[in-house]
Amino acid sequence: AIDCKTVDSALLPCVPYLTGGGTPTTDCCKKGVTTIKDISVTTQQKDACNCVKAAANRYPTLKDEVARALPDMCKVKLDIPISRTTNCDAI
């Protein structure tokens, strides 16, 4: 099973970017987005999606459009979107 704490700690270096925009840090891309990618390629994509969505919802100032752009900004292909409004059942 996927531990949401892993997702939370992976996204931590990305919080300044997710709430403020600009450019994500190397830590955010290398540790954060890559960790989520590694988790989401398992058979537990729906669980990973729910963890990412829950983490996103903990930050009321998170900018959804910035969050959705994060994988592209880091040049990482993610199968699950980083968003507060993702329908994880559709994944």
Curated annotation (Swiss-Prot):
Q: Extract the InterPro entries matched here.
A: Bifun_inhib/LTP/seed_sf (IPR036312), Bifunc_inhib/LTP/seed_store (IPR016140), Plant_nsLTP (IPR000528)
Which tissues show it?
Detected in seeds (at protein level).
Q: Which GO terms describe its molecular function?
A: lipid binding
GO terms in the biological process aspect are:
lipid transport
Pfam families linked:
Tryp_alpha_amyl
Q: Which cysteines are joined by disulfide bonds?
A: 4-51, 14-28, 29-74, 49-88
Kindly indicate whether the keyword Disulfide bond belongs to this entry.
Answer: yes
Entry keyword Transmembrane = no
Family indicated by similarity: Belongs to the plant LTP family.
* Known role: Plant non-specific lipid-transfer proteins transfer phospholipids as well as galactolipids across membranes. May play a role in wax or cutin deposition in the cell walls of expanding epidermal cells and certain secretory tissues.
The cross-references to PANTHER family, in alphabetical order and at most eight, read: NON-SPECIFIC LIPID-TRANSFER PROTEIN 2-RELATED
What is the designated name of this protein? Non-specific lipid-transfer protein 1
Its source organism is: Trachyspermum ammi
